């Protein structure tokens, strides 16, 4: 008979699996409580969550949500990291943590219901983050607007230059005519 706590854990895992875009499965052996806290903080900053769960409860939740592809990754001490929004930022946070003295061993993960190995996650880390994509898009949108402003301003500038040149040529022509008339009048 399952305990109330196990039922709640399965319900929580099911909710996380339904919301996630990517789940990373890792072995956390060798990490101290301080290391785990640091990792959780880094992941929270990237909009993700890091939980330790029993494999049997994780498997029950996975089967009930259609994520049974995760089963081969559930062996030994297992931690799950769930990314809900900015996946490249999430994977970069894991890679950044793993550059330190303590590391988690990434076994693989899920994108939707598709199983991924750790090499694919490294590729995802090389993708631009949501903020970087926004900056690129805004930069791409601003360039044509700047060009359009130049195109719109060019005819106005040309007209001003033409009028300026025309008024100067009229003045030069009038001055030349006055100069012509003055010597003949004397």
Swiss-Prot record:
One Pfam family hit: Ribosomal_L10
The record's section on CDD domains has:
Ribosomal_L10 (cd05797)
Q: Which cysteines are joined by disulfide bonds?
A: none
Biological role: Forms part of the ribosomal stalk, playing a central role in the interaction of the ribosome with GTP-bound translation factors.
Checking InterPro entries in the record gives: Ribosomal_uL10, Ribosomal_uL10-like_sf, Ribosomal_uL10_bac, Ribosomal_uL10_bac_type, Ribosomal_uL10_CS_bac
Q: What is this protein called?
A: Large ribosomal subunit protein uL10
Q: Record's superkingdom? A: Bacteria
The protein's matches in SUPFAM superfamilies, at most eight in alphabetical order, are given as: Ribosomal protein L10-like
Entry's HAMAP family?
Answer: Ribosomal_uL10 (MF_00362)
* GO terms, biological process: translation
Q: What is the lineage of its organism?
A: Bacteria, Bacillati, Chloroflexota, Chloroflexia, Chloroflexales
> What molecular functions are annotated in GO for this chain?
large ribosomal subunit rRNA binding; structural constituent of ribosome
Would you identify the family this protein belongs to, as annotated? Belongs to the universal ribosomal protein uL10 family.
Query: How does it associate, per the subunit comment?
Result: Part of the ribosomal stalk of the 50S ribosomal subunit. The N-terminus interacts with L11 and the large rRNA to form the base of the stalk. The C-terminus forms an elongated spine to which L12 dimers bind in a sequential fashion forming a multimeric L10(L12)X complex.
Q: Please list every transmembrane segment annotated in the UniProt record, as residue ranges.
A: none
């Amino acid at each position: 008979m399952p305990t109330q706590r196990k039922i709640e854990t399965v319900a929580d895992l099911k909710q996380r699996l339904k919301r996630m875009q990517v789940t990373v499965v890792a072995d956390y052996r060798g990490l101290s409580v301080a290391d785990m806290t640091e990792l959780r903080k880094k992941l929270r900053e990237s909009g993700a969550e890091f939980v330790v769960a029993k494999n049997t409860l994780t498997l029950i939740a996975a089967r009930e949500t259609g994520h049974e592809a995760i089963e081969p990754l559930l062996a030994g001490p297992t931690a799950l990291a769930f990314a809900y929004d900015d996946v490249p930022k999430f994977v970069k946070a894991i890679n950044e943590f793993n550059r330190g003295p303590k590391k988690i061993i990434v076994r693989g993960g899920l994108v939707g219901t598709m199983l991924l190995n750790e090499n694919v996650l490294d590729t995802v880390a090389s993708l631009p983050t949501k903020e970087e994509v926004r900056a690129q898009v805004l930069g791409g949108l601003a360039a044509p607007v700047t060009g359009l402003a130049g195109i719109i301003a060019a005819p106005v500038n040309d007209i001003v230059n033409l009028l300026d040149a025309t008024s100067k040529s009229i003045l030069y022509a009038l001055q030349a005519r006055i100069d012509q008339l003055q010597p003949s009048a004397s």
